[in-house]
Amino acid sequence: MTHTVKTIPDMLIETYGNQTEVARRLSCHRNTVRRYLYDKEARYHAIVNGVLMIHQGGRGIYDRNQH
C-alpha cells in the first residue's frame, strides 16, 4: 500500500488557490485551511491519504508560574 503525504499549500496549487474546495476535500472548515496556509514544511500539519493530521502542541500540565 502506498501512502501519499501532502500539505495544504500543495492542495491549494491543485485547486488553483480555492480554499473552500480544499476544505471540502478534507472535510474541515475553511478557517482550518487558512490556519495552515503558510505551513509549507509540514511542521504543524500533514495530509496523509486525504486525511488531515494536525499537531496538537501546547497541551499538558498547566504551569501557573508562566502566566
From Swiss-Prot:
Top-level taxon of the source organism: Viruses
Pfam families: Phage_NinH
Cross-referenced InterPro entries: Homeodomain-like_sf, Phage_NinH
Similarity comment: Belongs to the ninH family.
Name recorded for this polypeptide: Protein ninH
Gene designation per UniProt: ninH
